[in-house]
């Protein structure tokens, strides 16, 4: 294991070692990039979580960069926690247990649907929080396996429960209603977005994180571009 960490550091001399915070929770980073993306295409972004509870809600259009941002944060956080250098200009983190819901899958063998598997994952997170465990949570488009009304109601309830349990983390979503939670919890929730811009009938992405709730959606535009009548 030590040889692997040493080899990783040797192969990435431009990476830096993070500073370790001693108070739950803190993660502040500048110019974080995904280690698996080529340098010439890697767009870097910042993160700032200074206290508990605190959640970043990331909204945005399809392909705008939400999931890549979550993976960038998660990979660098894990690298920093195990003693490896990170792809960033600077990073300070508190080494809590990281829990994610990024690639939940169903199971025919266990007779378990995608939705039920996701519920089990979310229940595990709530249980650990209620037991007093310190977690850093990363969620990507939760409750995809149900209808939009049920999904919105469940997502809002989950976010309120996470805040009540002093949780910290990031959630990416297409549901703009979640962004309204910042008004209810201005000291615990912050909105950020990735935008898709349409110029001259072409879709462009900056992949740069911006403050606020997403303004542009692109699903219908992409359907039309693919020749599907909308």
Name the predicted role of every residue range.
Residues 3-13:
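Transmembrane helical bundles of ABC transporter permease domains
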Residues 13, 18-230:
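ATPase nucleotide-binding head domains, primarily ABC-like/P-loop NTPase cores
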